[in-house]
């Protein structure tokens, strides 16, 4: 959670993350960043990075975003590969920007689990308004 100067600033910060232009820019940054990842000392290369949107179902919440970053990681030595999923969610509540991340290998976290966690975060944040 990040507390900002005003509710307007929190809403604007979240709203920009839910635009196609921002996602396209961020996808390009991720692909450029990982395109040169040749393993280094970890012995792992990043073969592919994809970005997609995820639904955020929070009643009464205006600005929100959901984003999945999926990457294919390969072992330099064994050539085995695994998918990495990083799901990032955020919403504005008053002057707070609330974010949640879920990381999983092989398959993404179930949508139902993520939505239940988002609802729980929304309820808890509502109990302690800033």
Regions found by a protein language model. Give the residues of each.
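A ubiquitous, low-specificity "background" feature that marks scattered single residues
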Residues: 24-27, 85, 93, 128
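Sec-exported extracytoplasmic/periplasmic mature domains
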Residues: 9, 122-130
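A short, solvent-exposed beta-edge/loop patch
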Residues: 47-124
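A small/polar (G/S/T-enriched), proline-flanked helix-loop surface module common
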Residues: 1-80
